[in-house]
Amino acid sequence: MPYIDVFNGDADGICALHQLRLHNPQNSSLVTGVKRDNLLLKRIIATRDSTLTVLDISSHANRDSLLQLLKQGNTVHYFDHHFAGEIPESPLFHPHIDTSPDVCSSILVDRFLSAKYRLWAIVASFGDNLHVSAHELAGSLKLDPKKTEELRELGELINYNAYGETIDDLHFSPEVLFKALQPFSDPFEFYHASGELNQLREGFRNDMGKAESELPVRQTSAGRIYQFQNQAWCRRVSGVYSNQVAREAPDLAHALLVERKDGTFLVGVRAPISKPQGAEKLCIKFSGGGRAAAAGINNLAPEEVDRFFEAFDLQFTI
């Protein structure tokens, strides 16, 4: 039976799959994309009688495709922490779904594998801006601060690589980056040996240097909203910059609007770290989605921006 691995191109999706394939290697076909390219099941809608492993994309957003794939005799193993909606019922469907704000898909895989490759779950948790969870996992392994810091940087750099409107915006396609990880069961070996990581580190430094000169376009008691122009570096840095400003002001919500080539906006929302709730509720109102702590909108029309600002304030004003 053919194997197909479908995964979000961010650190969480890549590290979740890496853990599973270290445990159970397969000659799988890989299906992935940029961070926001999460309707990945549409790409394989004709698949029949295969084993699908799906990681870190919303089952709610992919529901129609998922139901069709189950009807076509595919066995589906699903690990995710985004808004799920109604969970399909099928003997072929094996869900591992937990939408709690302190977990990511790699933590769900870590649980499934009884912590066999926990170091990679720590990498993913840092990448997903779940620093408290990451430090708790690091504490369970008694990692020293230097090693924990290396895993933090690794997670944030892999995550940085996922953000863009298309693959052309990225330093590496997520498939290439995943394949670069595959020979390494130990993330510290990858950290010290990887040429890809050096390129990501340089790109990250350059892009963040530009982003840190930006000021909010709107600031209220609810939070801060930033707006970036239509340039590749703006798209690349959007996720890690959003995470950084969220950590700097943990009691505030944050949003970042990045202009797309068609004039609409790509929007990232971070709920306050001190109260990680409501991001997905806000974004669903604008045909977006995500999870309670962090969510997004793929195409916010310019005429909807003011309404988004008002809804943001309403959602996060205490």
Language model: regions and residue ranges:
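Oxyanion-binding "anion nests"
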Residues: 96-100, 180-227
